[in-house]
Amino acid sequence: MTIQDDMVGKHPIENDFWKWLQHEDTESSDLKRHRYLEVDSSNRDEAIKSVAAWLIKYHLSEGKKRVIRKKQEILEKHDFAEYAQSLHVFPKSDKTQKGNLGEIFLSEYLSQTSGVQILVYKLHYNPNIDQSMKGDDVLLVNPDKVLLGESKFRSTPNKRAVEEASELMKDKLTLPMSLGFIADRLFEQGKDELGEVIFDLQFKMSSIEIDIKNIGFLLSTKKVRSIVENNLSSPNSDFIFISLGMDDPAAFLKSVFDYAESNLLEGSYET
């Protein structure tokens, strides 16, 4: 077992990730803990389909799905497509698309590796879809473990991007800010018992030992591996950096949002 396995869990090898996502746990040191992920170019289309499905899941709430499903039953195909397009489910802003893609990918990956479920999809509560939401980029939590992530997207990787994805967490253990937000959403859903557990974690984090891990994430080209290896330095022993490399990340970004939008307009929005 690698240090990376111990911190965030083993890379998944028997599900959709295995088809198109390769991984390498690079050699660790006191100042560097790095897992490199790479989209397999030969399975890029599978990656686009998988990630597009995540975009729909993270942007489209169950309530909105019910309304859309009802409209789909009564509208002609062309009229339904016009209706679905008018809903503005996905951001048009390039900056927001990049931010959302990174956060969604990291959330899905960490949930797969750690087994910690995503309790609340925060983008369901975004009042302005073209602006990023404030608060923690990525937060997965259960009574025993907290995974807090900072995500960045760069078309070209560089030292500054690594620093930006690390700066909030690299020097000392960072605690989440959004536990109250998650608890409130659970209370609204009638999940009072779970909501109380999450709400109480704010106190317990300062008084008892809970496994908290900080994660920096950078999505970029395949050069990101060497950029992170050469520039990552963190004395925070609970900090790990995950990088994702692929051919032409800007084109990938456009493809996944276009595919998600197309599926929505065609009525294929169930995930």
From Swiss-Prot:
Disruption phenotype: When this gene is missing the Hachiman system does not confer SpBeta resistance in B.subtilis. GO terms for biological process: defense response to virus. Coiled coil: none annotated. Pfam families: HamA. The keyword Ubl conjugation does not apply. It comes from the Bacteria. Component of antiviral defense system Hachiman, composed of HamA and HamB. Expression of Hachiman in B.subtilis (strain BEST7003) confers resistance to phages phi105, phi29, phi3T, rho14, SBSphiJ, SpBeta and SPR. This is Hachiman protein HamA. It comes from Bacillus cereus. The lineage of its organism: Bacteria, Bacillati, Bacillota, Bacilli, Bacillales.
